[in-house]
Amino acid sequence: MKAERRSIVKKLIASVGALSVFGMAKGSTPQIEEKEVNNVTNYEDVPLFSGSTRMGNMIFIAGKGAHVEPFEIKAHTEIVLKELEAELKKAGSSMEKVLKVNVYLNDIADYQSMNEVYKGRFGKKPPVRTTVAVAKGGVPGNSLVEMDCIAYV
């Protein structure tokens, strides 16, 4: 029984070794895809950040905020979700393909009202989500909420 197991293990190791050598053959080096960026924001003529970045079938959407009146959480949440959706569409994805959302609230007291607008926006299989309240002034500009997300194509 032990000899039989050893024989099987030896064959398995030999097979894995052969596959490794075969995989290292000339010309089999995997091509690394180039990162694709969209909506680049410059600072003093130097690229600062992108509105979205795509690598393979993964899309990373930069934080979106609402910097307009009315300064009310439900209105800002609606604006931010629409901006996320527009950026996802430009990148070839959709709200239903979002895997992860980060929500940054200017005030944790806005949590429930933000949820009222947020619910149902990502289809029947919502993404995982992290929500944090940042210190006053922690959300850039005068937005009451900022969101970013990760999706696939």
Language-model features: locations:
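Hydrophobic pocket/interface hotspot
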Residues: 84, 103, 114
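Short, well-ordered amphipathic alpha-helical segments that serve as non-catalytic structural scaffolds
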Residues: 74-89
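N-terminal presequence-like segments and the immediate start of the first folded domain
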Residues: 2-78, 106-153
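Alpha-helix N-cap/start motif
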Residues: 94-95
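Acidic helix-start/capping segments at beta-turn-to-alpha-helix junctions
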Residues: 98-107
